[in-house]
Structures are given as C-alpha cells and as structure tokens.
Design a protein with these regions (language model features):
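Hydrophobic residues positioned within well-ordered beta-strands of beta-sheet architectures
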Residues: 6-8, 26-32, 114
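Short acidic-hydrophobic catalytic motif
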Residues: 184
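Short hydrophobic short-linear motifs embedded
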Residues: 155, 163-167, 174-177, 192-221
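Histidine-centered catalytic/metal-coordination loop motif
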Residues: 17-101, 218-224
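N-terminal intrinsically disordered, cationic/polar leader segments
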Residues: 3-19, 33
C-alpha cells in the first residue's frame, strides 16, 4: 500500500434524499490521503483552493440523491437548493468514492490521491475507507450511456452534478460544467510566462490558502 505524505480532512453538512423518499440531514467528515507531484507552489495552492471550493461552495448544504430519483427534476425546477446526483443511493461509501474521483480529476497532475476515509452521523460514525483503484472500478461498473464524457465526478471542470429533465417528451441531460477560470482557479494564468511572479501572487492571494509564498510581518487583513 502506498504511504501518503499528506492528509487533508474536512467536514460538511448536507441532506440525503433516499430512494424511499426520506429526507435525512447529515454531517460528514472525510480525510484524503495524497501526494503532491507538482513542484510549482502556485499550482499546489490552486489545487487546494479547488478542493475547498468543492466542499465549501458545492457540497455544503446540498441535497444528495440517486440520479434516477423522480424527485430530482421536481426539486431542480422548484427549489434553489443545489442537488448532487449519484449513480445509486447516496451511502457514505459512494459519496466517498465520487468525492475521491472528483478530487483526483480537478487536481490532476498536481496531486495524486491514494485513498480517502469517511464518517457520518447517520452512519454511526463508522469509518468507510476507499482507495483510488476501488473508486475507479466502482465508476466503471456503473457506466451510464447518457454521459459521453463521464459523470460530473470524473470530469476536470468545476461542475458537481448532472440533472436529467423531461420537457415535451424529450429527455435532456443538464451538466453542471463550469470553467475553473470563472472562479480564478484555472492553471493557465499561472503557466503564462509573460506574467511576473508578483502579479501571480496577487491574483492567487485573493483568497490565500495553504502555502505562504511570502512571509508577512505585522497585522494582516486576510480572513483566512
């Protein structure tokens, strides 16, 4: 088993919509084991910000449910709550597996994820451990022909759900597939050799995280 030099843990709250149409509030804690394989500190920092965006902006307070749940289309049309669809009922193991695959996809070439572990209040705080090979095999076994480029959790974009709707008898797949540049979290800006390091730092420091590129003295106005 690969020994991971880094661990990152985060917690979020959300709601499960079960196949039995039960609405269940839940709190999850997940820990990722990974290695940093890119020496560029800007890219590492952006990778961490992408992970935080995934949990803080998309996973937090969202509804988790089966892609084929008939309530998905109704909730999508009537509510503003973000709905995250999965290929089966949203058990902890499947949530961990899809989160691990998405983490690998959105940090590809910068971080290399080996495994993750997840606990939740509804799961009696029992720890589920998923390695990356198991997650990949699970995704392959649940192949859906509706996804020509794969479901949200294997795409590298800033999308975090797929919604199936029916209008006038036509079935439409709505993909949440935004560009990371919309959130100043794209790699290209930092790969541009025409932009000097100070400008890259200022751009990145709009929401500074994880790796201090400059040691600051005195008071700081940063919220982090």
């Amino acid at each position: 088993m690969i020994k991971s030099p880094f661990k990152w843990t985060t917690t979020w709250n959300g709601i499960i919509l079960s196949d039995d149409n039960l609405i269940l509030p839940n709190t999850w804690t997940i820990t990722f084991d990974y290695n940093a394989i890119d020496d560029d500190l800007f890219r590492r920092d952006i990778a961490m910000q992408r992970l935080e965006y995934m949990f803080e902006e998309k996973f937090e307070t969202s509804i988790w449910t089966n892609f084929s749940n008939p309530w998905v289309e109704i909730l999508y049309e009537k509510m503003n709550t973000f709905i995250i669809t999965l290929p089966a009922e949203p058990y902890d193991s499947l949530i961990a597996s899809t989160a691990l695959l998405k983490a690998q996809s959105i940090t590809n070439g910068v971080f290399d994820f080996h495994s993750c572990s997840i606990t939740s209040n509804l799961g009696y705080k029992v720890t589920n451990v998923i390695d990356i090979e198991e997650a990949v095999e699970s995704n392959d076994s649940m192949y859906n022909e509706k996804f020509s480029d794969g479901p949200w959790y294997v795409r590298p974009d800033a999308g975090f759900t797929d919604i199936l709707t029916t209008q006038d008898g036509d079935v439409t797949l709505i993909k949440d597939s935004k560009d990371w540049g919309d959130y100043n979290l794209n790699w290209d800006y930092y790969d541009d050799e025409n932009i000097d390091s100070l400008e890259k730092y200022k751009h990145n420091n709009q929401k500074e995280r994880w790796i201090p590129l400059i040691i600051k003295g005195g008071a700081s106005d940063n919220e982090d």
